[in-house]
Amino acid sequence: MINFFGGKAPTAAQPASSTSTAVNGARFASVSTSSSASASAAGQPPLKKTKIAPSPVTVVTTVKKKVAPPTSVEPRDPIAALSGYNSKNALPEEKRRRIIEERLAAQRQKSIESSLEAQLRAPTKSLSKSQSASSTSRRSAASFSKPKTKKPRKKVVDSDSDHDEFGDYGKSSRKPSTAPSTPRASKRTSVDPHPTSDSYQKVGRDGVQPNYTVPRDIRASTSPTNTTAIPIDTQSRPSKPISSADIVTANIKNYGPYFNGLGDAPRAVLEYPGTDASEEFLLLVPKDADEYDPLMELLATVRAIVTHYLTPEQRKAFGSLDSLEVSNNAGMILPSATHGASASTSAVCNMVAALTDSNGINGARAKSADLLDGQGSKAERRNHLVGAGTYKDTGSMTPEPHANGISQTAPVSPTSQTSGISASAGGSSVAKTVLVNNALLRLDSPAPTELSVASDHSSTPAASCGTDPDSILRSFTKARNRRDGPLFMRTLARFNSALAALRDTGALAANIADLGSCTGVPEGIWRLIQDQVYARVVGPRVEELGRYQAFSDNVYGELLPRFMSEIAQLTLLGPEKVFVDLGSGVGNLLIQTSLQTGAEAYGCEMMRIPASLASQQVVEAQLRWAAWGLRGGSAIEAWQGDFGDHGGVRDVLKRADVVLVNNYAFLPKTNENLSLLFLDLPDGAKVVSLKPFVPPDFRLTQRTLSSPLAILRVTERLYTSGCVSWADGGGKYYIQEVDRSLVREFLQNAGAATRAKRGKVSEGDDTVAASDLMVGQDVRRKRWKAALQDDDEDDDEF
């Protein structure tokens, strides 16, 4: 720049460093501008505008320096690293190494002992630590490709710590076991904390077989069975079972007629396989399905006799079993008996009047019509029905009453009745005469109407000649379906005649003997007999069984026949065995067990009404067994009282083989008192209950050694539907077997452990004495030091 005053313009100062910024240039420009302004203000001529140099460019240079690696440090001695000391140590090198090696050896020995102990506690562990360590390198490569499957941990049940002085017998008597773990991805389910062990097993339904029978001699004996179950209401033992007609008569208002042509209260007699055994039935049907159905029972009895008491050759004379239909007939009362209230009332009055005339009210058997009617009354009734000269040449004889007092209301074979009829008589007169003869044998029923005579005449052509073309079983079904009363009575007479012929010749007795030696009493027989006994004794008083105190030991519930049959099969009940039911109720299981297996049966019930019914059922069952030609066990008794105080229960438990306790609703105190009775049971006896007496976590130790539960070995089982009366579904029940070997083994091993401990003490007497001396010296030394400290403290205080 040129200066007009002859001087040079001041040169711009060079930047001090290459990193100067444009801000400095701007600062210089402002300075020069201010100086020129000041010069113009001083009167000097204006200067030319100077050119500003461009701002310098900033250049950033990055320099990379190579850092030298750190100096390598020599690795430390592994033994020195383990010991924590530096190489420079006060101890000599050899001694220091020896100490470290001994420490490592002790650690290895300790790890080996711990692994062995873990293997003994968990024997299912497959891999040891050494094997798992050697295979870790091989699994590490595969771990990147697929995820590891985590094994469930096994829970080991340890023993009690306060009984180590008895060796292994301070532990539980049951083997330790593991509980299954729940998968992490699944929902949490209930885990059984008490799995199967030697003393507690869960077998479910294994070994259960249907239709348990015991081959034995089942023929009825002439000597009465030993029993003390005498009915409370009567002092003398009845000689005959309660008939079906007696049960219906006592509740006649709930029944109505079923057959046409038989009147309001028709009676029929059914022959049984036993000697001179028969039963009287009223051929009526109930209005309600819950009531007793006499017609269905009669047909069921016929079917059972033909099925089980006859050989295939003998069965041909009765017909095919498929042709006999047995079903409930409740509510199927004749329409004529239900037209209006007046008709129903008159029908009931007629039935009551007929039953009163036959002396059938209140359980008394109807007398024979021949005993009620004289010759004059019979002649008058005959003349009223068919005229004076129609019957005098027939030659028909009215059958004599049975020696047992039961009226023979069912006619004998129609062929014998019509053998003396004149050949000149027409078909209508013959049919009418047959019907009149039937009516004469049923004098408690009204005379048949003309409609019934016509229906009887037009039923089949063979009926006019006194024979039926169908078999006996088929005729029963046809008469029931058609409501044909006369046909039903003729068919029943044919059945009685054929069965009596087999009974009189001894064929039925031989069949019963063969049946007993092959299979014993079939299920179809003992079930039917038990239903008959229950319907006659318990059925009329079933409402009284509901009178009990709720939430007490007297809550009533029954075990059904299917359940008892399963228990008998699993416990191998049979002859020469003793069965005891504690809380026997009405005695159903006593009756079933005695007849099905032939075992002695004893029961005890606290409540008065069920105990009374049980006594009556036992008597009725024995009478019915004789009617069927059968016999039960050698003894059957039902007692009333508390089984904890009853003397008979104490005596019979000493030789019992199976004890049944329905303790489903028992209080805990009752179960505890009941378990004390099990101490009298012999080895091998089984206790069946619905609640376990031995909990699954029971442990046999010195504390529980005196418990009555220590001698029981438990098996948990499952029952299905149809086994109990209070629930439709299934449940659990328990069979506890008396096994005193558990306690004996415990005591033997505990004694061996004690003797071994005493032997160790005797061998180390010197060591023990020396150790006692050292302990004594140590104690005296501590006391001397404490005394010195006390003296020092006293001196300080002074």
From Swiss-Prot:
S-adenosyl-L-methionine binds at residues 556-559, 579-588, 605, 642-643. GO terms for cellular component: chromosome, telomeric region; nucleus. Residues 9-22, 29-42, 53-73, 125-146, 415-425 have a biased composition (Low complexity). It holds the Pfam family DOT1. Keywords: Chromatin regulator, Methyltransferase, Nucleus, Repeat, S-adenosyl-L-methionine, Transcription, Transcription regulation, Transferase. Residues 439-751 form the DOT1 domain. Its EC number is 2.1.1.360. Its main location: nucleus. Ubiquitination of histone H2B to form H2BK123ub1 is required for efficient DOT1 methyltransferase activity on histone H3. Histone methyltransferase that specifically trimethylates histone H3 to form H3K79me3. This methylation is required for telomere silencing and for the pachytene checkpoint during the meiotic cell cycle by allowing the recruitment of RAD9 to double strand breaks. Nucleosomes are preferred as substrate compared to free histone. Belongs to the class I-like SAM-binding methyltransferase superfamily. DOT1 family. In contrast to other lysine histone methyltransferases, it does not contain a SET domain, suggesting the existence of another mechanism for methylation of lysine residues of histones. This is Histone-lysine N-methyltransferase, H3 lysine-79 specific. The gene is DOT1.
